[in-house]
């Protein structure tokens, strides 16, 4: 499932926000919320930030944190409301306001409130210094509004400001969501002209070749990444093998990822489930999904639960598939593909 990247503005700010002015219970609650947010425990982070808001402790920062947590949980209107409250907080400084504007624009983009998202992007451009992330965000909003020239201009500025493999891949993925891969491929090609230095570089190069369906070079780069101890490289190698229809080697990579990753194996189990689906081993796929859900983040849970629906469809158990997609949409109501799937399953169940 393709999901738009959540813009991670001001990641250094998370560390800065750990500095607190006084001790006691309120400080501990706030600090724990910050830690939970960094670790991807968004439900816990949200509860902590809500407690901080109620206590009036670091209110602007707490509204920001609650907004980000809600954004990751898929509660986009809640995210907008929290971030708006933070922006209206008289204690919010200029840097924090820019950060919250960017997150609010992201939530508005995901809610398809494109005019509001673009208005926030324009406020950032008028009142603050633009950077690679804000150019990228503006490009995503423009692309969603079918303003292709404006999107291209902002993506070019984003890549000029940050010529990393990661930025090139993110721009490509934005175009991929609009079925405009050709427009994004040039960024991948440009990035691949630079020399890899680190494990992350080799991993990103492998991902770029994977998107370009150059699986031979993808395996070469990812093997080098794995040799440099990249666990993500193992996962991506599994994706490359699966794309080639080699589920045996894909399965071996996903199993290696699970064993290497240890505390966060959900993506590996999801990969195993996809291999089992391809091989027609549907009960095994359900077992893999169950194992993955035990330690899944919100984003990982979304993939696993959606694939669970797919498995029940493959088993021709449309009643269970319908029940599962209804549960899924309660958690992720903005997933358009799932909404279409609901209509299909209702038709198969006489709805």
Stretches with model-predicted labels:
Residues 57, 91, 95, 128-130, ...:
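Short coil turns that delineate tetratricopeptide repeat
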Residues 38-39, 72-73, 110, 144-145, ...:
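Register position in tetratricopeptide repeats
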Residues 65, 72, 96-103, 136-137, ...:
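Canonical tetratricopeptide repeat
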Residues 18-21:
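C-terminal motif of bacterial Sec signal peptides marking the signal peptidase cleavage site
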């Amino acid at each position: 499932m393709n999901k738009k990247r959540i813009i991670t503005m001001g990641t250094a700010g998370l560390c800065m926000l750990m500095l607190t002015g006084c001790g006691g219970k309120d400080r501990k609650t706030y600090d724990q919320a910050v830690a939970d947010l960094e670790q991807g425990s968004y439900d816990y982070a949200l509860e902590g930030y809500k407690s901080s808001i109620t206590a009036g402790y670091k209110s602007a920062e707490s509204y920001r944190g609650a907004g980000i947590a809600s954004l990751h949980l898929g509660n986009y209107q809640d995210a907008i409301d929290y971030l708006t409250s933070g922006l209206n907080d008289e204690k919010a400084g200029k840097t924090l306001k820019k950060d919250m504007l960017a997150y609010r624009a992201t939530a508005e983009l995901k809610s398809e409130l494109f005019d509001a998202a673009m208005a926030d992007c324009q406020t950032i451009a008028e009142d603050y210094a633009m950077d690679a992330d804000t150019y990228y965000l503006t490009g995503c909003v423009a692309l969603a509004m079918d303003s292709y020239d404006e999107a291209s201009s902002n993506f070019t500025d984003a890549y000029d400001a940050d010529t990393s493999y990661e930025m090139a891949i993110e721009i490509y993925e934005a175009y991929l969501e609009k079925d405009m891969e050709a427009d994004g491929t040039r960024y991948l090609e440009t990035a691949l002209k630079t020399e890899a230095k680190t494990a992350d570089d080799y991993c990103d190069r492998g991902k770029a070749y994977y998107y370009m369906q150059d699986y031979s070079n993808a395996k070469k780069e990812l093997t080098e990444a794995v040799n440099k101890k990249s666990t993500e490289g193992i996962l991506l190698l599994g994706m490359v093998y699966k794309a080639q229809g080699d589920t045996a080697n894909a399965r071996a990579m996903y199993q290696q990822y699970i064993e290497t990753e240890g505390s966060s194996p959900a993506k590996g189990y999801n990969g195993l489930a996809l291999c089992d689906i391809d091989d027609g081993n549907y009960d095994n796929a359900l077992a893999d999904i169950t194992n993955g859900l035990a330690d899944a983040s919100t984003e990982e849970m979304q993939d696993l639960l959606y694939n669970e629906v797919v498995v029940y469809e493959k088993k021709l158990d449309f009643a269970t598939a319908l029940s599962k997609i209804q549960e899924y949409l309660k958690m992720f109501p903005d997933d358009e593909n799932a909404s279409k799937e609901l209509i299909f399953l209702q038709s198969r169940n006489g709805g």
